[in-house]
């Protein structure tokens, strides 16, 4: 089935390339070999390859050849108060390619009154005409309605979508109740898709926002104060509980705190099928900047859940990422200019949420995890590319350097260093939340769909060249365990005879507006237990008694001291 839709942008001829002398790095092995690329695919891998004449040769000696990065979380068209982000599909995907990412997964967020299917079509139209690299789509469920099952089924079967996100925050806008989550998770499980959650306790956040605003706290620091770490951790634990009961695989987006990450790690150790996604911001900086005297700088950090002010959080998250307790990395890239952020200059709750990270993600993970010795080059490939491709079911088309895979490749220089700055980034915003951070490791050449997109610091991109990548359901990486548990977890009642004894009659409380309380129906004869009447006791102080026939003395004198006799020589 084709999911390409109505896209009519002409395909651009791919380059014919020979990458020589590089060290190929996949998630499970590394080796030296040459790579022949043609028609947008990897044609050959090996030594002394026979290739056509006139082919472009790229010298990769001393460098690594990696599968292109996959950014699992972007919001390049997220509508906020009638505004759209500064980095749209064109600028955002250009920045992605500059950083070594060759595929993104963007979130469809339906406007009020717009169906999931209609919103999906809107996103496809925007991305097809502007994206510079390949992309796919998650769909956010922003409200519950009776026909949601039919919409989800259509998106899965007809549109190539296999992941849906629900919100536990943003009360009165898109927050789901626990019962709604359980029902949605059950539908998603039956469809073979993946349930995602934005995990925060929206009720507490709203109350904290009101309290802080009443105290006169209106600046960006109010945002982090109204989103304490505990509301994220509690929501993660609750989401894990609901997903486990529904036997639905769970994917937690934007893991920002130690508590949330630990809740995921502990759930995995209990056997829950759950995946956690730290983002560039939570791995590369901290939330101390919310208290900056520069309002615009502080506002640039506003996102939900917030960047944690604890400076040890990033180290904790990179440790869990290196150990496998967290599996993927995203950017949650959603940027707004200072003028757009200033909509909330007098009320932190109105500041558009979102940070940058799409361009910096690959280098930041290398700096924090590989250069620091926490993970090796293969694990780096896993958390920046391969695991995402496996979880969302487009592996090995993406996420692997192998014959037949898409020619989305990054020639990586582990010795390169760069200092992140708003003066040099490929974004349309004035502030970069990683300003001044020095990173070791950077892309030297980026190849997208078999075409060179970055070389010698120069970009070669074409808006609209990006293709939509459809995803099938029931990915093995996720659903093998779910299927096994479905077979093993069948529930059977205990075989027993029908109870036919007495049943006590009770009053069932009436529902509001239904009139008088109803009497519970009882199938058997009612047996009323006896009640003792104290006024009808058989005991009497007058008349004949049962022991009147026993002879009694009129009196008996007892010779004993007060308290009775005692014998100090005997303890018996």
UniProtKB/Swiss-Prot annotation:
Listed Gene3D superfamilies: Metal-dependent hydrolases, Urease, subunit C, domain 1
Location within or outside the cell: Cytoplasm
BP GO terms, sorted: nervous system development
Chief subcellular location: cytoplasm
GO terms assigned for molecular function: filamin binding; hydrolase activity, acting on carbon-nitrogen (but not peptide) bonds, in cyclic amides
CDD domains: D-HYD
GO annotation, cellular component aspect: cytosol
Keywords: Cytoplasm, Phosphoprotein
InterPro entries registered for this protein in UniProt: Amidohydro-rel, Hydantoinase/dihydroPyrase, Metal-dep_hydrolase_composite, Metal_Hydrolase, Metallo-dep_Hydrolases_sf
Domain of life per record: Eukaryota
Record PTM Phosphoserine, positions in chain: 537, 544
Subunit-structure text: Homotetramer, and heterotetramer with CRMP1, DPYSL2, DPYSL3 or DPYSL5. Interacts with PLEXA1. Interacts with FLNA.
Family: Belongs to the metallo-dependent hydrolases superfamily. Hydantoinase/dihydropyrimidinase family.
Function: Necessary for signaling by class 3 semaphorins and subsequent remodeling of the cytoskeleton. Plays a role in axon guidance, neuronal growth cone collapse and cell migration.
Protein name per its UniProtKB record: Dihydropyrimidinase-related protein 4
């Amino acid at each position: 089935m084709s999911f390409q839709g109505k896209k009519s942008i002409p395909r651009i001829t791919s380059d014919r390339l020979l990458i020589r002398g590089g060290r190929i790095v996949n998630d499970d092995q590394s080796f030296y070999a040459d790579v022949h690329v043609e028609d947008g695919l990897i044609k050959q891998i090996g030594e002394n390859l026979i290739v056509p004449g006139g082919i472009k040769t790229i010298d990769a000696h001393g460098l690594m050849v990696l599968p292109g990065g996959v950014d699992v979380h972007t919001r390049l068209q997220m509508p906020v108060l009638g505004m759209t982000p500064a980095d749209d599909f064109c600028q955002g995907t250009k920045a992605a390619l500059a950083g070594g990412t060759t595929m993104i997964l963007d979130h469809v967020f339906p406007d009020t009154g717009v169906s999931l299917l209609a919103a999906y079509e809107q996103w496809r139209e925007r991305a097809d005409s502007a994206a510079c690299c390949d992309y796919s789509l998650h769909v956010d469920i922003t409200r519950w309605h009776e026909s949601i099952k039919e919409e989800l089924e259509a998106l899965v079967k007809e549109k190539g979508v296999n992941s849906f996100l629900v919100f536990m925050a943003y009360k009165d806008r898109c927050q789901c109740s626990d019962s709604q989550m359980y029902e949605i998770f059950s539908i998603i499980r039956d469809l073979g898709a993946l349930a995602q959650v934005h995990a925060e306790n929206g009720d507490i956040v709203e109350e904290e926002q009101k309290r802080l605003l009443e105290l006169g706290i209106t600046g960006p620091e109010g945002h982090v104060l109204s989103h304490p770490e505990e509301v994220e951790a509690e929501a993660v634990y609750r989401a894990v509980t609901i997903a486990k009961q529904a036997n639905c695989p769970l994917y937690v987006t934007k893991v920002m705190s130690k508590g949330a990450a630990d809740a995921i790690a502990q759930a995995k150790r209990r056997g829950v099928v759950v995946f956690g996604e730290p983002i560039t911001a939570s791995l590369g900086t901290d939330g101390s900047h919310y208290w900056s005297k520069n309002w615009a700088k502080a506002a640039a950090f506003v996102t939900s859940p917030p960047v944690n002010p604890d400076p040890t959080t990033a180290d904790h998250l990179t440790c869990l990422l290196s150990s496998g307790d967290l599996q993927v990395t995203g950017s949650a890239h959603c940027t707004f200019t200072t003028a757009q952020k200033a909509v909330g200059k007098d009320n932190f709750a109105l500041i558009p949420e979102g940070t940058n990270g799409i361009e910096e993600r690959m280098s930041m993970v290398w700096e924090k995890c590989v250069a620091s010795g926490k993970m090796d080059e293969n694990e780096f490939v896993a958390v920046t590319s391969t695991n995402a491709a496996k979880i969302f079911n487009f592996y090995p088309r993406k996420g692997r350097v192998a014959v037949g895979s898409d020619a989305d490749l990054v020639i990586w220089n582990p010795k390169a260093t760069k200092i992140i700055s708003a003066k040099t980034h490929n974004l349309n915003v004035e502030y970069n939340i990683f300003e001044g951070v020095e990173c070791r490791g950077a892309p030297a050449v980026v190849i997208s769909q078999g075409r060179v997109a970055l070389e010698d610091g120069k970009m070669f991109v074409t808006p609209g060249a990006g293709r939509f990548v459809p995803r099938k359901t029931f990915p093995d990486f996720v659903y093998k365990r779910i299927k096994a548990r479905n077979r093993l977890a069948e529930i059977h009642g205990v075989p027993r005879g029908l109870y036919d004894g007495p049943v006590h009659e009770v009053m069932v409380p009436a529902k509001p507006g239904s009139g008088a309380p109803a009497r519970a129906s009882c199938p058997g004869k009612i047996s009323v237990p006896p009640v003792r009447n104290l006024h009808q006791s058989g005991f009497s102080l007058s008349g004949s008694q049962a022991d009147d026939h026993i002879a009694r003395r009129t009196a008996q004198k007892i010779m004993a001291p007060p308290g009775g006799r005692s014998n100090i020589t005997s303890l018996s």
